[in-house]
Swiss-Prot record:
Region of interest (Disordered), ranges: 1-81
Family annotation (InterPro entries): DciA-like, UPF0232_actinobac
PANTHER family, per the entry: UPF0232 PROTEIN SCO3875 (PTHR36456:SF1)
Family, as annotated: Belongs to the UPF0232 family.
Organism of origin: Mycolicibacterium smegmatis
NCBIfam families: PRK03195.1
Basic and acidic residues: bias regions: 30-52
Highest rank taxon of the organism: Bacteria
Protein name (database record): UPF0232 protein in recF-gyrB intergenic region
Residue stretches of biased makeup (Acidic residues): 1-14
């Protein structure tokens, strides 16, 4: 008894398809090569990229052939570039320059304004050109307000004009006497500490 999956090999009675008339005189490998050439020609006529099989890549014939030359001791476009220069070019090309400048104001605060100011004031936010600076005491906040124009000039010299247009100097938050969940509003905070 034989089942549908029993296969003892090709049937002897199966007809072998005959090649087309224009290929009737070819046999064996010549028939295969000619058929492959026709298939590649049909693919080219449809605009498809035709593979080259196992042969190597096609060499350029004539035309604009340039031999590589040594770059010499001077700087060249192929020389390794500094990481800072490459990232700066990337930021410019992607339109990130303003965001990078804003981040450098906060990230390099101590280098921008100096140690004496950085010890008593911390930048907290930069939104639309307004830099919010929190001072550790009301006296420090008052001193920062007096030198505000010099601070803006220092910041503009380091990161460029227009990044920071105004300084908002905030003193320390006063203590809260609020206890519990419920609260009755009083007369507001007093400047008793600071």
């Amino acid at each position: 008894m034989t089942g549908p999956f029993d296969d003892d090999g090709p049937e002897e009675d199966a007809p072998v398809p005959a090649p087309p008339d224009h290929l009737a005189g070819l046999r064996g490998i010549d028939l295969v090569r000619r058929t492959l050439e026709e298939a590649r020609g049909a693919a080219r006529s449809q605009g498809k990229d035709v593979g080259r099989g196992r042969s190597g890549p096609a060499r350029r014939v004539g035309g604009n052939r340039r031999r590589r030359t040594w770059s010499g001791p001077g700087p060249d476009a192929r020389d390794p570039q500094l990481l800072g220069a490459v990232t700066q070019d990337l930021a410019k090309s992607r339109g990130w320059s303003a965001r990078v400048a804003e981040g450098s104001v906060i990230g390099r605060w101590r280098a921008v304004v100096g140690d004496q100011i950085a010890d008593h004031a911390t930048p907290t936010a930069l939104n639309e050109g307004v830099l919010t600076v929190t001072a550790e005491s009301t006296a420090s906040a008052t001193q920062l307000r007096m030198v505000q124009s010099q601070l803006l000039a220092k910041i503009a010299a380091v990161v460029g004009d227009g990044v920071v247009t105004t300084l908002k100097i905030v003193g320390p938050a006063g203590p809260s006497w609020r206890k519990g969940r419920y609260h009755v509003s009083g007369r507001g905070p007093r400047d008793t500490y600071g």
